Structures are given as C-alpha cells and as structure tokens.
Amino acid sequence: DNHLGLTSLKESHDREKIFVKWLDSIKHDAEIIFLLGDLFDFWFEYKEAVPKGFTRSLGKLAELSDMGIKIYFFVGNHDYWMTDYFQKELNIKVFKSPELFIFNSKSFFIGHGDGLGPGDYGYKRMKLILSNPFFIWLFRLIHPDLGIKLGRYLSQKNKLISGSEAVSYTHLRAHETSP
C-alpha cells in the first residue's frame, strides 16, 4: 500500500522514488511482479482522463513491461476504479478480485485482501455501492477536476474516521533495500 498522492506532494514523491528504486533493483531478476492494490491513494479512470502525477511509477512500470516482465495489478480499496488504462497503455493485467495462481505445483491465492475476512460489514456495503456500474457511470458525469478532488477528499476523510494512516516515509526509509 504505497498510497501515492497521500499527504504532501514531497512525501508522495519520496515514497514514489523509493518504489521506483525498488522496481529498478528487481528488474533483472523478476519474471512476474504482483502489485497488490492501493498503489495510489485515489485512482479513478474517466474515459479520456486519469489522475495526473505518478509519472515516475507509471514510466518505470511501462519500462519493465516493455522488457517482457509480466505485471499483474490487483486493485485495492483506493484504486478499484480502474478500467483499461493500465492494460492498454502499460500492458499490465488488472484484477478486480483475488485469483488463484499455481507456481511449481504450489497454490497461491493472491489479491489485495480488503473486505475478505469476517465482519467489517459497513465497508462491504460501501464497496458494493462504490463498485456498482451505475454509481461509476454517475461519477463519470462529474468533471475530472472536481471528481478527482472529491475522491481524494473522501479518501482522506475515511482515514481520519477509521484511524487508518499511511506508512510514514521514515518507516519506508528504514526498510529500503539497496540495489
């Protein structure tokens, strides 16, 4: 959960640079990369517009995809409004729900994990509404400048209500890998 776009622009850029550095460090060894959601704090694709920013991450993902590395993106609860941008522009397969993969005769159930466990019925109801095609269609009627601003505001508001916080930059730096 990088939540790019959360907090200040500088903090978001710092997290993004660490993520890109990590991608650089694995590009010669990786065959498949699984991104497990919430790469962005808010992502909503309009038919002709996507949120601005994140150019370092998107460019690096495109580079790795162009190198032949398979990249699978499992949407999280902050970026599940993806349609076809990642597939068309970056050649990244997007999954809206967890999937079973088998590698070397071992099974792996891979996904973001939000709302899979017992309880949290309020979130599960909210997710049904927010992932409803009619609701998404209505939201697309809002101009992207207003819609993206509203989405970011609601994402921040949700964190304040739930007590959820993004991982601090200091925490990320402490766990940064050297290439």
What residue spans do the PLM features occupy?
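Active-site-proximal loop/helix segment associated with metal-binding centers of metalloenzymes
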Residues: 113-169
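Surface-exposed loop/turn and secondary-structure junction residues enriched for glycine/proline
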Residues: 7, 43, 53, 103-104, ...
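Core catalytic region of metal-dependent phosphoesterases/phosphodiesterases
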Residues: 4-103
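Active-site-proximal beta-strand elements of phosphoester/diester hydrolases
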Residues: 1-3, 107-114
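Charged/polar, solvent-exposed surface patches and flexible loops
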Residues: 21, 63, 84, 88, ...
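Short, well-ordered, mixed-charge alpha-helical segments that flank or form enzyme active sites
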Residues: 80-84, 110-111, 117-120
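Conserved small/polar residues in nucleotide/adenosyl-binding loops
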Residues: 170-177
